[in-house]
Amino acid sequence: MSSVFAAHRFPARFAVWRAFLPRVDIRNHAERAHDIRHGLSVTMLVLCAVLSACTKSENESTTHEMLNATLWRQSSAEYPAIARQTYRLASMNLDQALADPQWTAALEQKGNTTGLPPAIIADLDETILDDTSYEVRIIRWLGSYSPESFADWCREVNASAIPGAREFLDYAVAHGVAVFYYSARKESLRECTTRNLRHLQLPFPDETRLLLADRKSKSDYRADIAEHYRILLLLGDNMEDFVTGSRADPSVRIQLTDRYIQRWGREWIVFPNPMYGHWEAAPYGYDYQLPRTEQLRRKLRMLQ
């Protein structure tokens, strides 16, 4: 077949073949391509946003103001040594208190204490119970404390005992001393708190020994117990575990410490808590609604 003949016949053949091919809407393909490109763009934007959020969350975690304090509590060799040392001091002081009929730890204790059975009052969180796993959650996910997230943590019944706590409490009970626990936890957390104490096999004879915050202040609880017991020791990690008026300016809080200087390490046994407490909120006036940046700015101003 000659090339000229083929050239004349090709258009006709192409027309025949085209009759059997599906119709192609070029405009529709262009729109689909645009949609695909748009979808990929959106997907990439979402992916970038997620990765950015993850990076931001990780960066915020590594710069969270509680990171070093919580790390020290959980991983340092010094903290368990300090905790056991503090409980050992409490045991020695308990022996002295039992031998001295005039010994009392509560400022709320009035009148003659002769004949009253002995008791001690211990704060729970970060004195008896170790809640640092909750602080880890704050650092990694939450950003700051909230009553709801803390309640969720409490209901898991996963708090461990502070090193030395069980040995000291068993020692107190063996010497005929009643153990009372008071806490800033709410009444709605009574059942899970009770389960946690019993799970750790800590002395807990009945519900009257667990005193929770939304019924009375800690000072009122001390006054109530002082009517029926001679209070030998107070144990805690916050000033309000020992004395009223601690929710105050930092300078006032230090004045309270100085006023009762003879009681520290004797009737009053304090535990270190570098993670939270009234000390942390005092620089910004306990105004928890302030933006975090403003809270930090006011804390920075406190430094000398």
Briefly describe each language-model feature range.
Residues 54-122, 285-293, 297-304:
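Non-catalytic pre-domain segments flanking phosphatase-related domains
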